[in-house]
Amino acid sequence: MRLKKGLMISAIALTGVLALSACTNSAETAPEATVEEDVTFEAGTRMAELNEAGEITIGTKFDQPLFGLVGPDNKPVGFDVEIGKLIAAKLGISADNINWTETVSTNREPFIQSGEVDLVIATYTINDKRKEVVSFAGPYYEAGQDILVLEGNPENIEGPEDLEGVNVCSVSGSTSEANLAEYGAVVLPAAGYSDCLEPLRSGQVSAISTDNVILAGLADQNEGFEVVNNPFTEEPYGIGLALEDDEFRSWINDVLTESYEDGDWEAAWEGTAGKVLDLPEPPAVDNYARP
């Protein structure tokens, strides 16, 4: 993780109070990706196996507004979900044949390693430690860790330097939790970020800290909170997959790059997170060599 004080990311700019249902209602998400017909892949590749199976299992968050949140129809919606649909469509797999599995910060690597999921697209920060056990395509978005406080910011928390000795809620096993320790915060671990809201309301903690896009979704959905808007890390979101499958990773990177150029990535954003956040520049994918 690269700590960078003062980093500003355009995607954090909120555009007013919008109903979260407007951006998570499945009827108002991005247009469905066009499923490739008669697509063929080299025999023995993971792409060929998935295409032949006609289905794919993708792990994503079920409780994160804007990126991955289960809707009234019990299906996840959000930007991560749309990225998953784009990849599936290029494999010749329709959205109806995606098996969505809930992943949280503590089980993403185990789910990939065990084969329980084919991919993880779940606000999943790429870092060197994780690269030791799983591989990453992307990044497809870059966030930054920020801070959520009560509306009006009664404790005048302006940045991470103000968190020393302060009770802060974050998710157990996340990069956000580790970053907070570097600033001397007293971390109250939670299973999910929605579980942090009541401790903040009640005064058990003074702040919640994680990626700005996650906090923006929470603030948009729940009254009485605001984002400090002072991101202090770089969080490149990647698509997790099996460690040694370089061919699949390279293919996904090509799909992402194509989506930047043909407008599919932008449509996925505007139909989900773009209901609340400004359109960012897509990051260049990183075709890194495995250690």
Name the predicted role of every residue range.
Residues 142-149, 216-255, 277-291:
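Periplasmic-binding protein-like
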Residues 41, 175-188, 227-231, 255-291:
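Ligand-binding clefts/hinges and TM-proximal coupling segments of bilobed small-molecule sensing domains
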